[in-house]
């Protein structure tokens, strides 16, 4: 095989023929990001980008190309480039630590990539013809990266010196138009005869081993190749020109000699060139899932990126937006790869072949693809701990509580190690700040505590902020209304100190007492008793007290004892069904009679239903006050039919509620249908009905109903509880007087008097969102981070908890918390009830009529 080098041709020259520039106007509100190091030279980043067009989910792999142990290689199916496979299996079989999908490929079988693949200085497959204009990305031996359109020339000479122009190597795209060359990198065996005529010439060590026509597939020799064609004239030439035992020569001329190329792979568009957005091809316009690969200016870092799209939470990206994102990530040159359903990034976080697909494939699963681009760690094995990282379940805790410590161990190459943390020693500074027992830090005095974990010569540190005792306790709920033996997770309990700092207190440190035997709390889960009652849970820690009022069970009101049929009527579906209701003394749970329902579901079409309607004309019974449930006794027949009720709300909207999905018992059983939360009262009980939709249950039967009751929450009681402890903000005052600067906010308007140490901007929530399209608003809010020694006020038109997307809340809080490092920050809104919550130095304040804040002698006071 003869390889020659010919001049490379710039991709831009070709792309200009069919493209036009599209500038990106993408506005980024904020990036939520996290990073995980995969090795000393490889890192994974996840970025959720809030933009003017919506949310983007961006996954990034960064690889240091100067590291001698880091390698880039194209990857493909271990069964050859003619076979598709999901990216995760390619990562497993190749040993890569991370990878993204490759370029365009033929979706049929056998598949082929549009671009070339060079791996370990070996040509695996050549690109499609030059006219297609797809660029090739190559790492050259001198450390440079070349992005250009290749124009290879492949020629094979028959035994009689006949010249055959071969369009591609290891692709069957041209097999019907001329000859193609297939090596063992294509597949283990040749295509062979199927429905179309085919001639295959087997070459071993440049000698014709066999000339085959319409034969089954044969093994492709490791030290040779197969020349194949289904084109009539080419097949005739091949039969005439290739003779068994005669020599053959193959000449492949590439833009670069493979010996000068570390690796090559194909791409779709050259989207960033020399640090600027390049001319963008008009192919695949619109916002879609995207994959891109870029390099920094000196080609020392490779940046692989996926952007999710076609998803309810993520909008995808246009090519122009992709180009801008690549520039923002540090790319000086970049290409985009195949996208859409092919966009995939996989990471082997623990280097154990357990690959995680970190993006969200738009098809809902990985697509089988033809190739990928992998990053490899070739570090020497080492089990010596070089670095220790410590994570705490809480970095801020109250004194005399605890925080869990989690340790991660790495060798000198930042490869994770599986080390038993029992072999680690700890040191706490100051020495009297606390102690570590079984990887749990127990603080013994307020202040800063530095914990050092060490093993051998390796160590890691973490600082824990220890708060003094809390003055108040907070929970997400102040009251509970539960049925009998119900369980309710109370969630985290938050302590607040005198300065407004807060931390979660583990439930094991909370003392729980009870008023009126309503139930019991274990590990933060309350279980109600089986007796109706009204009482309270009292939670205490140190001097802080919090009450939760609890109502258990129900107050019952009997609606019908079923002693007669007044106001009751039976209707059936389908109408030709049969059935009857009657009052009977045969079975009675309470009293002397019950309602007997005989039903016949044998004439079912799509379903069978027996309705017991309430009211003389089926108008129903309007229920008093606000019932929580409807209950009754039912004597079942174990026929497994569906027992339900229909109610209507104040607007006449019908709601169906289950008593039981299946009547699967014989004898009396109490059943309940709970009224849905949020329903608009008053409600009307329309009917009770037995239904069946399963045609295998066409049968007859009888059930009995007794003592229909409406269930209300228990009445309030005077509990005589001690007062809860409260947090009182030292900045809060009853009046703002003698100020040098003052801001008043009322009903969304504000009046500012003074010299400009108070900065106020407006935050607008509309339809559950702080719209990313409101660029002025977000720029104002982000400008808070640039101020120093100011009082910053964000006047909201509603509670930030009314924002539907938790990520928006997180963005807002991150911006405000960064601003609070050098400023005093307030978030205020008119909520009708005065309240102050301090979270990470940011004050969230609810005011009832107006909010006033003033400064005098650098002292800040506010009134809400």
Specify the residue positions occupied by each region the protein language model found.
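Extracellular carbohydrate-recognition regions
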Residues: 551-578, 713-735, 743
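Low-complexity "stalk/linker" and mucin-like segments enriched in Ser/Thr/Pro/Ala/Gly
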Residues: 427-440, 513-525
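Beta-strand-rich structural segments
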Residues: 401-416, 451, 486-502
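His/acidic metal-ligating clusters that form di-metal
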Residues: 771-848, 852-864
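Short carbohydrate-recognition loop motifs
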Residues: 585-611
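Extracellular glycan-recognition surfaces and repeat-rich motifs
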Residues: 568-595
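Zymogen propeptides
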Residues: 22-227, 552
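Extracellular carbohydrate recognition and processing domains
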Residues: 652-685, 700
